[in-house]
Amino acid sequence: MKKSIVTVVILVYALTAAQAQEQILKPYGIKSAIIEYTYSGDKTGTGTLYFDDYGMKSALYMETIMEGEESKGWVVAFGDYQSMWDPDQPDDGMKMKNPLLSWINEASNGDYESFTEEAYKKMGMFKSGKETLLGKECDVIKGDMGKVLVWNGIMMMMELKMGGYSSGQKATSIKTNVAVEPKYFIIPKNITFSEMPGF
């Protein structure tokens, strides 16, 4: 069940990122940002998302507690791959083909908005009005699994439930079009990454 909800969360991240402005066909509608999040539900904690080049480079750092276990982790998407590792266990990590690239390429060959809406429909989630969070007017996407708020392709809030598992994430601050240090997108050379299948 945990694996299923993690897969859904990754899909929601990727799909919200795929809602970029049609003119630029990039993951997000703004060039750069630093966003702080809190997590709730079965996993609690905090996270910080850094991105540049309209999301073509992104890094998410999380410190969370789940079932009494504390964990730290980086998820860095840059180029063809998305890499994940725990800074406290730097010997090995995981990587997968960056799902955004194929989805963006597919979207650019057809009707962009229809593609995004169809992708959400497959998850049973549909656009449902607007809500404001941190001064940003967000699209509301709802379904049986829960609700997501999206602004310029950026996930601002998420509430999901699957079986007895719940997952929440909410932006607590956002700085847009700021300078993001390149160090956040560097993959450590001392880590051996095992490749996992993509979507």
Label for each model-derived stretch:
Residues 1-4, 19:
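Positively charged n-region of N-terminal signal peptides that target proteins for export
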Residues 16-22:
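Bacterial Sec-dependent signal peptides at the C-terminal "C-region" and cleavage site
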Residues 4-15:
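Sec-dependent N-terminal signal peptides
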Residues 22-199:
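Extended soluble regions of mature proteins
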